[in-house]
């Protein structure tokens, strides 16, 4: 990464209050800071980031709002986003106005632009009022954005009927979105389709934005990126995988248990399946027990992340679960793990994931094949692409049974099919690595972005 340069100007960033959105936003912030820009992060009380020695060069400001702290949990992400955007539109204008007053006497502190998470679309109106350049940042991929846009158009023509009618129609392919089925569209598990579409209408509206940054790679999504360019008619900058472009301080909700690395050090190469279903996924007790039984039957080693409170209606501890499995030498269970370190470890041969975009990029960036068990929104799009387009994993659908778990694990860690996926995953890893090096597509895209700011 380049040395820090003389400060150019200041960029204001607005992350969405979710771990999967904060991490790439801070990676983007670090990349821009290393290119010479001063950074201001505008956030609500729902964000997890706090000023620290790792972020000493960043300015943090709080967008005042009066939503109860319980809203994020009680409303669910979709209804919460709708309410948060309405609440923050006026207060962010005041916030931005005060920031401009503070900086106007310092020429080098002039605000170059406002970069906002696509789901924090209230920022567009405020930046427009002060005639500041606006840039949308998508922490998800280009295909997911295309799906959200398509859903808005389909909804207007009652084209989402297969999602509502059931009777097997959800298995039908969506026109012009091959290989995606209606069931793969990024609907939310927390709200009806109508509410999701309401969010998508605003998040997919470029408004007066002058550009869009996406945490993706050209070699992964060339057709979706071309579609996006034609649809939005503004410059699109695919600069990912951002975790390979710049490091950022940890933004984990939970403390990472690094003892699992010591355990991995004792395992054979490519012998362990790493299981982590992200920071939101909730499981029924029955599903956890079926997974445990399937892992036992597979006769393979596993590192399993089970967050506190992620098993519905159960007080079963990780220690109790491992004891019930009666295979203490073959498994290790932690509350949270340093995922990048885990995926980079030579002992890890497969990743059972919810397929959040950050996790998917991190897995592909290390050449690790995936077992996909998506839960909500873009995870379903990502899982379908992992299996059918990039062909570096398999998707587990339907009811979770021990036999299904056992077969999926063996497919990746034991069968010849898994070896073929591993080779494709390693090839993809090299392509991603090249993309962020000088001359690579993402490196060049970042340079092009910098020239416009």
UniProtKB/Swiss-Prot annotation:
Pfam family membership, one: UDPGT
GO molecular function: UDP-glycosyltransferase activity
Domain of life: Eukaryota
UniProt KW Cell division keyword: no
Residues given in the record as UDP-alpha-D-glucose binding sites: 279, 337-339, 354-362, 376-379
EC number from the UniProt entry: 2.4.1.-
UniProt cross-references to InterPro entries, sorted A to Z: UDP_glucos_trans (IPR002213)
Similarity annotation: Belongs to the UDP-glycosyltransferase family.
Protein name, UniProt field: UDP-glycosyltransferase 76E9
Source organism per UniProt: Arabidopsis thaliana
